[in-house]
Amino acid sequence: KNATIVTQSADFDMASEGVMRSAFGLQGQKCSACSRVYVDKRVAEPFLKLLVEKTKALVIGNPAQRDVFVGPVINKAAVEKYERSVAAAKRDGSLLIGGELLQEPPLDRGYFVSPAIAQLPLSHALFQEELFLPFLSVGIVDSFDRALEESNRSHLGLTGGLFSNDEREIERFFDEMEAGVLYVN
């Protein structure tokens, strides 16, 4: 359950592209996928707008085709977990995009779901679950300190990401983030 932090000094185009690619590349079915993003409340609206736009533009289909970015999830159990996660997001937060099982030809010959982005309360269980799905949980925070605290609140932490142009934030991230591999910008 890898976390990324987006601060008010971030380049939002770069941050939205990086988060989208990390969350939804290989359908989120990789150990290094970004599953949680913590966004400074002062920049949440413009960042999330770009993230949703970029996610909406993703091509879903046969991953062997050149222009396809999102392929199928692995099996029916993954679809069921996706549907439970979407239902929880709708019930407890706000689903910004996604949530559909895609069954129109040619997507009817596989387990295709639309990449989902959900804004949730910071205490929500989905921030702690390792889903291995194209599902991104968004938490809005009021400070960089809170973003670091929330990022480190998981017992999982293979990778951690930061989008910031503030050198002090970058230094603190490298010193305080509890993850094996760290990425900046």
Label the model's feature ranges.
Residues 1-122, 149, 184:
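ALDH superfamily catalytic-core signature
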Residues 59, 105-185:
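Conserved C-terminal structural/oligomerization subdomain of aldehyde/semialdehyde dehydrogenase
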